[in-house]
Amino acid sequence: MILYQVHHMWYETAMIQECWDSVLAALKASPNTDVKIEICLNKQTYVEKPNEGSKVDDFFSKHLDHSLFKDPRTSITIKTDKDPFYNIADWRREVYDVKAKYTVWGETDTILPRDFFAILDLVQIDQLHVLTFAGRPMWDNSWDVVTHERLQGYSKPCQCDVHKEDCIELLEEPFKYKDYITQAELDKFNDESGDVKIEQVPWKIDGSTVCISGGLETPFIAPGMHFVREDTCFEYYIRKKKIPQVCVTSRLKGHNY
């Protein structure tokens, strides 16, 4: 079984439709894969409050008819101001299934490769590990180890004065990390990327679509940590435990920062 979990804050809801459409498309592309979905709708206003006259419930209401919300595989958790402060690091620390093949960290701003669940279903790695999907070129070269194989070779950050031939700014949209990529653009790019290739890489974690194999000791995020840098905390954990990271270098995720 694969557990896909995602935490949505009320102020992120403009991105939910695209996120859920993408998850649903990946589920439909792999109909025989056993997948459970766990979604947290976080209505807390401890950090930010809606504009005067707006209600937090209104931000979520238009999404409640979505097919993913009604899917029998989907479980919903709701957090409100009646609960103690709770955020994405709490969710990621708590929602991990030690018996699942993978627990996947979804993100509101991230769309999936169409064959995402099919790949996870087919992969067979007989040891504890973390699997990630390739990203677009980031703000510095340290991220090249988890960058898609077709998007390598650009100098980062922008250094046009000394890197006129390979400056990151020469890469066309939407293939830099700061560009917005649509599902159609992502699907086309991945369709043109050939066979699935998986390689062990040096540890480098960004929180979107991290796929954590079953069997890890918990907690792997510090108790009491609520949000910000929980992915870095997890990277420190797997480094210390020497748990290998592998990357699907030929499949791009759509992390729209």
Ranges and model annotations:
Residues 113-221:
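Conserved catalytic core of nucleotide-sugar-dependent glycosyltransferases
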Residues 6-20, 43-47, 83-86:
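Active-site beta-to-alpha loop of glycosyltransferases that engages the nucleotide-sugar donor
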Residues 228, 247-257:
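Active-site donor/metal-binding and catalytic loop motifs
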Residues 227-236:
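Acidic donor-binding loop at a coil-to-helix junction in glycosyltransferase catalytic cores
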Residues 1-7, 23, 35-39:
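Hydrophobic targeting segments
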